[in-house]
Amino acid sequence: MRMNGNDLAACAVIALGVGGVVVGSLLGVGNQAVTLPAVNPQPVVVDMPTEPEPTATPEPTPEPTPTVETVHFSATGDDLIHDGIFLQARERGGDHYDFDAAYAAMQGYYDQFDVNWLNQETLVNDEFAASGYPMFSTPGEITDTLYNLGFRVFSLSNNHSYDKGAAGIEASMAHWAAMPDDVVTMGFYNLETYDNYAYQTVNGITFGYLSYTEHTNGLPTPSGTDYGVVYLDDHETIAKQIADMRPNCDVLIVSAHMGTEGTHEVNDFQRETAQ
């Protein structure tokens, strides 16, 4: 359709009119205020990471105070009873042996120790007559004196262990077995198992005891005996006994009766054995 000039002018006016209405709506027409619709902003919820609750620091557990146990230990030897000692004891005792006078100078000395160990170098029993050098046997009453002095641990392995043969071993072991329960002896071992071990617990500390000898003055292990000494050159048996006992005690005490008679000089055998 073709529009004439007047039609074009009318269209232009309408277009302008529409534009005026739009502008007027925004800016206000004829100075009249235009109220815009109220806008109610909605709160925006944002998930924020939650701060962890502070963890209370635990109080440190105090280290337990270790319990310290102390044992005072003495070792004495050799208790070798010659004729003059037991004859004097018999004279003092009359109808028995009284060895107290022989040890009078030691009275009270051993009270300062918790454990008193002694090498009893002679067989002790009442089956054999008392005898001195060279084949010793000591009356059993000597152990009353030794016990009263404070001795509780006795080593029986030394060069005089076989002085009275198998019967001497048996008589001596029977005597020691009759002593009070707190007496511990070692040195005569079961010759099949070697496992009759000696233990003692003092102040919560467990001791194990082993004792050996270098020789028995040339006397062999007596025939007919089930018990005997272990010689220091029997390394295999010694190693086994030590391995057996170590797990069962806090302290393992091993005594070795060895050396050259009549001198304090250390010989090669002593040095090698100790090392």
Which stretches of residues belong to each language-model region?
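Acidic, metal/ion-coordinating pockets
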Residues: 7-11, 15, 19-275
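Short, Lys/Arg-rich N-terminal segment immediately upstream of the first membrane anchor
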Residues: 1-6
